[in-house]
Amino acid sequence: MSDQTVIQTRGLTRYFGPKPAVYELNLAVPRGSVFAFIGRNGSGKSTTIRMLLGLLPPSRGDGTILGFDIRRLPPQARARIGYLTEEHQLYGWMTARDCGEFQSRFYPRWSEKIFQGVVDHFGLKPEARVKDLSRGERAGLSLALTLAPDPELLILDDPALGLDPVARRALVESMIYLTRRSDRTIFFSTHDLADIERVADYVAVLDHSALRACCPVEAFRNEVRQVRLRFAGPPPKLPPLPGLLQATRTENGMRLVFVRYNEGIERSLNTLAPDQIEVSALSLEDALISYLGERGEKSFILSEAETPS
């Protein structure tokens, strides 16, 4: 693992019974990046994160985080990692101030300035008890407690799940603020694809336990194209087409979504004798949704993150 790679896995696999939850995962997360890790429910995202943090042993394969073997993470490595989940588990009887004072005792690099900054950003009162906080306020307090130790690597497991739009925006804005430090890395899973467009540099797509794409966000957006075909009558049957992610028929046309659309595919489409072929880009959200469709194939996009310089 190079100094520029913060997380790396090689063939990382975890079985629960006969079924793999994560299968042969090869992943590399560059230092200083904001890395989005997405997939449908049950795709293996949380299982992967738990393995990375040494909370769940892999069935086979290996990985490193901050240069340390994930099977044997020492305390000095854990002290450099901030971890936030959707549960936001806190002591209900404590106040926001109590939570900060309690946790600060365990972290020599604790920054009261960061803690207060995030708490203020979410409009939390220091004397408010955890049990009386809304879900969004609990998320804000959890984020403040995670960031105040000034972690080198921040791992977020869908922390905005279930938040209202205002609380979600506050959480995303806090992430944007964090990216100002070039040496900090953020690895986050999310169900909200709009979050990725706002903050992420890289995206990895996990589906049916396997990695399907891993590359810079801009490269992903550039690789996926929408193609509309118009015909004088009902559209003919499609031939086998490489890289086809989605196909939708209308009365006199088709809407197709491809990864790595090229001249060879266009020649194949021209054999259908359409009146018109119109090629256009998709939003990142639509491209990701298309990529997760049942028709898609695996590993169309070669990861540019696998071999960071």
Model-based region annotation:
Residues 10, 30, 230-232, 259, ...:
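A structural detector for beta-sheet-dominated domains
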